Amino acid sequence: MDLSMKKFAVRRFFSVYLRRKSRSKSSSLSRLEEEGVVKEIDISHHVKEGFEKADPSQFELLKVLGQGSYGKVFLVRKVKGSDAGQLYAMKVLKKATLKVRDRVRSKMERDILAEVNHPFIVKLHYAFQTEGKLYLILDFLRGGDLFTRLSKEVMFTEEDVKFYLAELALALDHLHSLGIIYRDLKPENILLDEEGHIKITDFGLSKEAIDHDKRAYSFCGTIEYMAPEVVNRRGHTQSADWWSFGVLMFEMLTGSLPFQGKDRKETMALILKAKLGMPQFLSGEAQSLLRALFKRNPCNRLGAGIDGVEEIKRHPFFVTIDWNTLYRKEIKPPFKPAVGRPEDTFHFDPEFTARTPTDSPGVPPSANAHHLFRGFSFVASSLIQEPSQQDLHKVPVHPIVQQLHGNNIHFTDGYEIKEDIGVGSYSVCKRCVHKATDTEYAVKIIDKSKRDPSEEIEILLRYGQHPNIITLKDVYDDGKFVYLVMELMRGGELLDRILRQRYFSEREASDVLCTITKTMDYLHSQGVVHRDLKPSNILYRDESGSPESIRVCDFGFAKQLRAGNGLLMTPCYTANFVAPEVLKRQGYDAACDIWSLGILLYTMLAGFTPFANGPDDTPEEILARIGSGKYALSGGNWDSISDAAKDVVSKMLHVDPHQRLTAMQVLKHPWVVNREYLSPNQLSRQDVHLVKGAMAATYFALNRTPQAPRLEPVLSSNLAQRRGMKRLTSTRL
């Protein structure tokens, strides 16, 4: 990272620290200049005749996602109706604590959400009320918000930013076409779904029914994102959203806000008069777009003209975007959040999710509470229509997933621990039984004082949906140990099964190698290296012994490629943002994975290991053989094995990692491509204990060699810990 990027990264640390610290303090004031004094909330009905309204009894509370003076946001599961089993976010507002300002915000949010229908805007499914409370049932977005990702990774690549801004531009244009000014654009209000697409939320500060000729005058939003015309209260239109769009772009690209003083007064002065310092590490197209958005005269701002969003879409920064494909969500997001099962809440603040979800009865503000909030009930039209089986996504009822951050439920409350399966230097693996369902799992118990499990958990959550990667079910943290609950591998270790198998041929060896190499190619393409791909970490899911049941396990030493600033890199953008030595190390680690697969393939074919004769070989002897790159490819089984097999083995075990095959090259090798023509004849094998002992000796010798310094997760740094406070709050005057 060059000096200018480091400067912005440091500014980002303190920026995030300050805004997180301020999140707990409510600085919102209200002077409803546009709306006047509101005595009654009048919201027209949107419920179609003949369809049953929703009520609180139809929702099972699972977790608390957020909480404020207004009420709570819960993760809930619908337990009745055609969408039973579906997960939602339920926003609960207490009528008695809603001031006039809050009632207007609730009215505005509910009205707008009921009106809009867009792929990049959060959807309102139900709205209803009881005597004391208002309920909004919304999409549950498992990926958390953009602020969480930005605060962890400091800044994004231009390709990442281009994707997020493009989806956001379509969402804002849709709101503007309905006469709505959003007015609170910031990373906290941009959510990510499980695939990584955005959805904007929180319409409490939005202004409805504004056309291009009418202006709004409220002083509202989040100071750092306010347009100059909002700050000086001379009236604003939809153009104010494009200024905020520019602030968000600047923040994502640099990790810093463009205008931020030591207090609100200084920040407002900077917005009105300060000259923007343009970071020179940004591309010319990015700088051009920022300058076009940061026009203090809103009439000159990009997006404010008669063509609206088309001006932005035509800008050279977005030249690679196919807008129709983007709208259909056919462009793959640059970042996929680490999510596991549907009810996982890893990306939500553990301060809230650790709380017991309870919805206490609300006290009505007055005897005419229902009159004040009349017409609040709503049912989405998509729920009124008879859903097809394809549209209905029934979520099975699972126990609540416990977060890495810990809570008041201990692992043994839900599971019964059984015998050991395996023991490592920093963890032990045991069989366990889920008490409620009597289902068997494996639990990996990690000593936190010896190893930080964060990287392993993130990788398993992000990539564990692959059919040949072990699936993570639950995560518990009791402060001293972390418990990773995973599917139980009933088929045992790959090498055990192969060596004990009565018949095992060259053709079967190619099938096995193909399955594992496809898995590694997938991981390597995502910037993930396993780094501990020994045969004992490759197991069968069941007793079938089929290649499809193979699982790659134990990601304790795995790493995800990251830039120097901690940014999790996606495959397309590494060249410009990752230091050469990091790329070199990543390539070396990937080559080590292939070398380990070469060891496995050699053993499957020859019936013995290439560099160790038995468990009594010393580490020095084994390392000397590995260093020389000499091993037998003649005699024994090798005399009946194809030349293609010998070729792929030699290229996977090449002593120079730069000349070793990649995973993709292995998959394209004729021995793998044409495996149906390979010999089905049985291969001879040595004693299983002798081979396993030699394999263990090989990896023991390798593990004795000096290791590169272990990099701690970004969030464990002192600077990152100082950031972990609170977020910016919105203001309305």
Curated annotation (Swiss-Prot):
The residues the record assigns to binding ATP are: 65-73, 91, 421-429, 444
- The protein's required cofactors: Mg(2+)
| Keywords, alphabetical | ATP-binding, Cytoplasm, Kinase, Magnesium, Metal-binding, Nucleotide-binding, Nucleus, Phosphoprotein, Repeat, Serine/threonine-protein kinase, Transferase, Tumor suppressor
- UniProt-listed Enzyme Commission number(s): 2.7.11.1
Sequence ranges assigned to domain Protein kinase in this UniProt record: 59-318, 415-672
Q: How is its activity regulated?
A: Upon extracellular signal or mitogen stimulation, phosphorylated at Thr-570 in the C-terminal kinase domain (CTKD) by MAPK1/ERK2 and MAPK3/ERK1. The activated CTKD then autophosphorylates Ser-377, allowing binding of PDPK1, which in turn phosphorylates Ser-218 in the N-terminal kinase domain (NTDK) leading to the full activation of the protein and subsequent phosphorylation of the substrates by the NTKD.
Question: GO terms for biological process?
Answer: brain renin-angiotensin system; cardiac muscle cell apoptotic process; cellular response to carbohydrate stimulus; chemical synaptic transmission; heart contraction; heart development; intracellular signal transduction; negative regulation of cell cycle
Classify the main location.
Answer: nucleus
Per its UniProt entry, which superkingdom is the organism in? Eukaryota
Protein name (Swiss-Prot/TrEMBL)? Ribosomal protein S6 kinase alpha-2
Which organism does this record belong to? Homo sapiens (Human)
